Amino acid sequence: MSKTYFTQDHEWLSVEGQVVTVGITDYAQEQLGDLVFIDLPQNGTKLSKGDAAAVVESVKAASDVYAPLDGEVVEINAALAESPELVNQKAETEGWLWKMTVQDETQLERLLDEAAYKELIG
């Protein structure tokens, strides 16, 4: 069973074992508007928490998406190259950005649960 976390940078994380799926929240995609391009990290990229890992570009602006944890990218959502609008349509499911391994599970303890994230976006 997966557990979901959120960051103050408006990312969601779904944790299953040692693999974390990362995406931007529905709130974030609403703020950005229609996405037109997404630049994802490459498989095998080693990320440190806080690294700019991806870029989401909308008709309004381009925004960095930051690595929420230390780890290595093991899969990217290749469908987004042809269909970046998946993030607008299904940000917290089919619009995921990348999957990564977790190096330090204690970093999860510093993330937000759903209630804390809802309070943040209030």
Swiss-Prot record:
The glycine cleavage system is composed of four proteins: P, T, L and H. Residues 19-101 form the Lipoyl-binding domain. GO terms for biological process: glycine decarboxylation via glycine cleavage system. Keywords: Lipoyl. The gene is gcvH. Its cofactor is (R)-lipoate. InterPro entries: 2-oxoA_DH_lipoyl-BS, Biotin_lipoyl, GCV_H, GCV_H/Fam206, GCV_H_sub, Single_hybrid_motif. The modification N6-lipoyllysine is found at residue 60. NCBIfam families: gcvH, PRK01202.1. It comes from Bartonella henselae (strain ATCC 49882 / DSM 28221 / CCUG 30454 / Houston 1) (Rochalimaea henselae). HAMAP family: GcvH. Belongs to the GcvH family. The glycine cleavage system catalyzes the degradation of glycine. The H protein shuttles the methylamine group of glycine from the P protein to the T protein. The keyword DNA damage does not apply. Pfam families: GCV_H. Binds 1 lipoyl cofactor covalently. It comes from the Bacteria. This is Glycine cleavage system H protein. GO terms for cellular component: cytosol; glycine cleavage complex.
